[in-house]
C-alpha cells in the first residue's frame, strides 16, 4: 500500500477517488452534458496521474438527485445506454477503468415500477464488467427499487472488486458478503450529506479492518439546494488505516497504489487479525489443546442469521417487536410513508 506518488506497477493498482460536486439537473440533455464533463475529467486526471488504473466517481455524480419524481423517471437510463457510451469512450481514450453512477437505471417494468440506483464497473476497453443495484436504498427519502445481490469481478491487473452504494455501507453484512466472495477492494460510492460525516469516515475504516479488504470511497461535495455533501473521499488500506483522504473541496482527488501481493500475503499468512479465516476456524487453539481437532469450529453461532434465512417474515416480526410495526413514524411523518397500523375488519 503506497501513497504520495503518481505511478503504479505490475503489482500495484493505481486507484483515484473523486469529490465530485453534486450536480442539480432536470433533463436528459443536462445529464448527458454532465456525463461529458466527467469524461473530460477522466482524460485530464490520467495526464496528471499516469499510473491511474481505476477512477471512481460518487453516487449521483452523473444524474444528480432528481427531487421531482417525473424528472427522475424521464431521465432514468438504460444500461448500456447513452451515458455509458460517453464513459466508454473516455475509458478507451485514457486507457483506464472506471466506476460510474446511474441514478437511476430503468426497471424492467419501467415506468410502472421505480428505477434502480446502479453502479457500473467499466474496463479500459469500454466494456461493462459489473453492474450493481443498490440493495439498501436510503429510506424513507430514496425511492429506488431495491437490488438483491452483490458481485465480485476481476478488475485492473486482476484485483478482485465489489461495488456497494452509500447506505449499503451502514450494514456490516454487505461488506462481509463481498469479502467472503473474494473481494480485495470494496468500492463504496456515496452521495452522503451532513450530519453523518464522522460516522461514515469511521464505518469505512472499520469495515476495511474487519474484512481485511481495501476500501475506496467516492463521495459528493457541495450543496444542491437541499443537502450539503461532506466529501472526504478516501482510500483505505486493508489494515484500516487511511492512505489518502480528501477534505470537503469540490472536485478534490485522492490517489494511492494498492498492492495485490500484499493483501494476498496478509490473507494467507496473517494470524491474530486474519478475520476472514478466523471466522470459520473459531477457537482453534483451544480445540487443539482439548484434542478436538486442529481446525476450530466452522458452524455459524449467530442465531439471527439462521433465523433470517429460514424465516424472513418471522424475523421481521421479531425486529418489529422491539422497534416499530409501521415503516413511518407518527411523531415525524413523511408524506407518502404509512405511519399507522392498518386496521383489519
Swiss-Prot record:
The CN hydrolase domain, residue ranges: 13-260
Entry GO MF terms: amidase activity
UniProt-listed Enzyme Commission number(s): 3.5.1.4
InterPro entries cross-referenced by the UniProt entry: Aliph_Amidase/BUP, Aliphatic_amidase, C-N_Hydrolase, C-N_Hydrolase_sf
A Pfam family it matches: CN_hydrolase
The keyword Hydrolase is annotated on this UniProt entry: yes
Active site: 59 (proton acceptor), 134 (proton donor), 166 (nucleophile)
Keyword Repressor: no
CDD domains: aliphatic_amidase
Reaction(s) this enzyme catalyzes, per UniProt: a monocarboxylic acid amide + H2O = a monocarboxylate + NH4(+)
Keywords in alphabetical order: Hydrolase
Chain's role: Catalyzes the hydrolysis of short-chain aliphatic amides to their corresponding organic acids with release of ammonia. Also exhibits in vitro acyl transferase activity, transferring the acyl moiety of short-chain amides to hydroxylamine to form hydroxamates.
HAMAP family (UniProt xref): Aliphatic_amidase (MF_01242)
Family to which this protein belongs: Belongs to the carbon-nitrogen hydrolase superfamily. Aliphatic amidase family.
Protein name: Aliphatic amidase
Taxon lineage: Bacteria, Pseudomonadati, Pseudomonadota, Alphaproteobacteria, Hyphomicrobiales
Amino acid at each position: 500500500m503506497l501513497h504520495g506518488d503518481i505511478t503504479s506497477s505490475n503489482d500495484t493498482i493505481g486507484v483515484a477517488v473523486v469529490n465530485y460536486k453534486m450536480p442539480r439537473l432536470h433533463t436528459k440533455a443536462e445529464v448527458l452534458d454532465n456525463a461529458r464533463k466527467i469524461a473530460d475529467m477522466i482524460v485530464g486526471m490520467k495526464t496528471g496521474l499516469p499510473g491511474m488504473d481505476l477512477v471512481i466517481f460518487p453516487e449521483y455524480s452523473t444524474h444528480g438527485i432528481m427531487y421531482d419524481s417525473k424528472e427522475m423517471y424521464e431521465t432514468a437510463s438504460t444500461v448500456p445506454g447513452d451515458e455509458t457510451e460517453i464513459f466508454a469512450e473516455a475509458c478507451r481514450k485514457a486507457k483506464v477503468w472506471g466506476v460510474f453512477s446511474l441514478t437511476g437505471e430503468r426497471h424492467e417494468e419501467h415506468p410502472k415500477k421505480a428505477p434502480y440506483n446502479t453502479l457500473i464497473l467499466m474496463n479500459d476497453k469500454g466494456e461493462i464488467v459489473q453492474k450493481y443495484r443498490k440493495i439498501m436504498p436510503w429510506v424513507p427519502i430514496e425511492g429506488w427499487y431495491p437490488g438483491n445481490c452483490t458481485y465480485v469481478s476481476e478488475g485492473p491487473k486482476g484485483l478482485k472488486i465489489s461495488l456497494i452504494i452509500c447506505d449499503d455501507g451502514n450494514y456490516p453484512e454487505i461488506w462481509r458478503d463481498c469479502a467472503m466472495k473474494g473481494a480485495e477492494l470494496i468500492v463504496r460510492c456515496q452521495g452522503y450529506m451532513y450530519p453523518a460525516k464522522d460516522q461514515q469516515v469511521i464505518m469505512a475504516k472499520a469495515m476495511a479492518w474487519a474484512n481485511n479488504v481495501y476500501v475506496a470511497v467516492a463521495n459528493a461535495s457541495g450543496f444542491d439546494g437541499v443537502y450539503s455533501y461532506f466529501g472526504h473521499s478516501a482510500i483505505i488500506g486493508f489494515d484500516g488505516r487511511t492512505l489518502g483522504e480528501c477534505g470537503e473541496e469540490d472536485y478534490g482527488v485522492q490517489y494511492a497504489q494498492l498492492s495485490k501481493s500484499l493483501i494476498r500475503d496478509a490473507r494467507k499468512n496473517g494470524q491474530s487479525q486474519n478475520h476472514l479465516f478466523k471466522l470459520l476456524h473459531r477457537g482453534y487453539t483451544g480445540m487443539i489443546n482439548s484434542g478436538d481437532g486442529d481446525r476450530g469450529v466452522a458452524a455459524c453461532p449467530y442465531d439471527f442469521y439462521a433465523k433470517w434465512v429460514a424465516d424472513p417474515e418471522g424475523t421481521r416480526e421479531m425486529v418489529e417487536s422491539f422497534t416499530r410495526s409501521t415503516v413511518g413514524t407518527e411523531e415525524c411523518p413523511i408524506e407518502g410513508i404509512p405511519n399507522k397500523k392498518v386496521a383489519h375488519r
